């Protein structure tokens, strides 16, 4: 059982807008746009302080379509289609286990692209996703984030089951073993 002694936070974002397109000699088209600038999602995160600088944490996050409430990836096979993990923090860093954003995907805390859980950061590493990472979210993942080492941080992930069991794990080896110092 999880007890909310230290902190539990419910968070999310809703982004939609109205788009209007008018071509010369034609009628205007008015549409509702989902996720115009950011991702529609909600989540719950929590941390339990174990003392001596140690803590356990979790994150459960779901994306959705603002106009109809459906999940944003239409897979229907996950309770939380964005992130779902449990982790441990100590003076040696963080380790997490579960469904986690790929290293170069701009998704989640373990990405080397500088993204946050709220997708508020941009990065100069714009081509790393297409060059190395073949997915945005990885299942069955172990992720490590080092503490600050004189201005440097190490990000590392490993997954033996990125999308589904029918895929060969070796086809994702570069993405899973890629690390970054920075």
Could you describe each region identified by the protein language model?
Residues 5-20, 29-161, 166-168, 175-180:
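Outer membrane beta-barrel
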